[in-house]
Amino acid sequence: MLATEKKQELIDQYKRHEGDTGSPEVQIALLSERITYLTEHFRTHKKDHHSRRGLLKIVGQRRRLLDYLKSNDVERYRAIIKSLGIRR
């Protein structure tokens, strides 16, 4: 799981205004961090299929948020893709 400090750091980096925790950029950044953490987890725990299902759910959620952002504001979409280094 994400440490509180790391989570707050990501929120501060991607927030759109003060007190923002729910904008698509923040949500995508937090989900990307969890995906990275789980990917590392699976390198050592190859048979953890139960958690792998959760990873696929998180990846799908991030994809839906990215699709939403792409359809509403392409510039913000391109900025978040570039800053997180997501292949799309």
From Swiss-Prot:
Biased composition, class Basic and acidic residues, residue ranges: 1-20
Keyword Ribosomal protein: yes
Alphabetic keyword roster: Ribonucleoprotein, Ribosomal protein, RNA-binding, rRNA-binding
Family matches, as Pfam families: Ribosomal_S15
SUPFAM superfamilies, per database record: S15/NS1 RNA-binding domain
Name of the protein this chain belongs to: Small ribosomal subunit protein uS15
One GO CC term on file: cytosolic small ribosomal subunit
Binding partners and assembly: Part of the 30S ribosomal subunit. Forms a bridge to the 50S subunit in the 70S ribosome, contacting the 23S rRNA.
HAMAP family xrefs: Ribosomal_uS15_B
InterPro entries: Ribosomal_uS15, Ribosomal_uS15_bac-type, uS15_NS1_RNA-bd_sf
Function: One of the primary rRNA binding proteins, it binds directly to 16S rRNA where it helps nucleate assembly of the platform of the 30S subunit by binding and bridging several RNA helices of the 16S rRNA. Forms an intersubunit bridge (bridge B4) with the 23S rRNA of the 50S subunit in the ribosome.
Superkingdom of origin organism: Bacteria
CDD domains tied to this protein: Ribosomal_S15p_S13e
GO molecular function: rRNA binding; structural constituent of ribosome
Sequence segments annotated as region (Disordered): 1-21
Family in the record: Belongs to the universal ribosomal protein uS15 family.
GO terms for biological process, alphabetical: translation
Source organism of this protein record: Syntrophotalea carbinolica (strain DSM 2380 / NBRC 103641 / GraBd1) (Pelobacter carbinolicus)
Signal peptide coordinates: none
